[in-house]
Amino acid sequence: MRKPCYAVYHPALRLKCLVRKGLGKIKGDTDMCDKQQLKKKEKEKQRAQKVACGPRDPPCTFSRSYTDQKRKEIHLGSTEWGLKESFTLTRGPNRRGNVGKGVKRPMVNKKLGQLELTSLDLRWQKEGKGN
């Protein structure tokens, strides 16, 4: 009879994986664990990632709803600076023909230069006189 898998701390392999009986287990200790179960779990993970991104999309950094939400936030915030253009994402699952063009936006102020929004992976492009 096989022993059930327990969560074992292995100093060399700190990866925990869920296996038989739903308990955490280290990948290295296969004597007690079911290898097949591990493979199944990994395959499921990979499949889930493929479905999320779609076959031909670039590797997506954010989900579609997240980017839409962020875009709204940025657009709302942009009115404070007097920017009238909304922003478009250059990378991600919902880009349309604007690959590598950067994001066009008006110059706010010569001193301010480019607004840095670190929360999203966006590239800005200066536009207007004075650059």
UniProtKB/Swiss-Prot annotation:
Highest taxon of source: Eukaryota
Q: Keyword Metal-binding: yes or no?
A: no
> Is the keyword Nucleus assigned to this protein?
yes
Annotated GO biological process: meiotic cell cycle
Q: Where in the cell is it found?
A: Mitochondrion; Nucleus
Keywords for this protein: Meiosis, Mitochondrion, Nucleus
GO cellular component entries: mitochondrion; nucleus
- Role noted for this protein: Has a role in meiosis.
Q: What is this protein called?
A: Meiotically up-regulated gene 115 protein
